[in-house]
Amino acid sequence: MIDPADLPNPPEGVILCDWQTALEDHSDLFKTHLQSVIPLDQHKVSAHHYRHLDRGLFIYVPDETQVKDWLELTIDLSQGAHQQVLLVMGRNSRLTLVESLYNQTTARASQTYLAEIILEEGAQLDYI
C-alpha cells in the first residue's frame, strides 16, 4: 500500500490517492474505470500484472477542471514490483503530468508498471 503522506498535494479539485482510499472514498468512479482500457484478460502480460499487482495510484480530474501547474509523481518501483496508475480525466479538463520512475534495488525480479489513462471528450493531457 502507498503511504498517503508520500503523495504530493493534488491541485484543487483533483483526486489523488492510493487504491485502498479510492475503493473506500470513490468506489463507483474507481470501479467504473479500472481495467476499462487494459482488461485483465487482454494479454498474458496484463494478466500477469493484475495477478501480482501490489500498489496503485488513482488520479481523477473532474469535468471542466483546468490544472495550471503540473502534477509531478515520483514512482519508486523498489517499493512494489507491480504497480499501476489509473488516471481519469473528465470532459474538457486539462492536466500536465510529469512522472519519474526509479528503482533503488539491484535484485533481479519480475516487474510491471501500467499507466491506464482515460480521456473523456475534450480532455487534454500532457504526459511527460
Where do the PLM segments sit?
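Glycine-rich and polybasic anion-binding loops at the starts of cofactor/ligand-binding domains
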Residues: 1-128
